[in-house]
């Protein structure tokens, strides 16, 4: 039976897109004299601009995985997997096409910025990895799938400082962009895909528990407490790790 659509997922997706658009728009047009960190309004805007990318990545993993798991019928699952494979490849290709300088290409030159890795590349790769993890584990055990994606996300964030210190100079530049920002990439595969994996873990919880009577009040309160701790008192914990 088709499950009821969760409209708040659409709201999260819409919020992330709108925040991304306004963030780029204001950042591109705001004069330097108005970028005053002592102003409350600018601090608020900076904070929300800072969480836009994590929300966008988390929502992408949550939405894709929720749609994949909400119906266990084989025909539906295979359809979602095929669509996900297509979408993941499309996002990666589109990420490169958006960085392609047409005039330079007509002149027989491809600029280095063409190989920069951005949001679309990372989300596309995250979707492909989630599909692989589902086919490998989730098809047989949703619980096992949730453990794997949660563990992957946690490992990614735990070892990100060590990973950042690795030397990628011997790698082809086009590949190194996925792992380091030293050559100009804006987003890297690590740690950003970790947010998508946490989103996938949240999707499993939604699929399994969203029908429970007290799920949403408990989830909202729990996420509020977790978010407050992450914002104000998580630094010491991660430094300890």
Segments predicted by a language model, with ranges:
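Alpha-helical transmembrane segments and their immediate juxtamembrane cytosolic regions
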Residues: 1-241
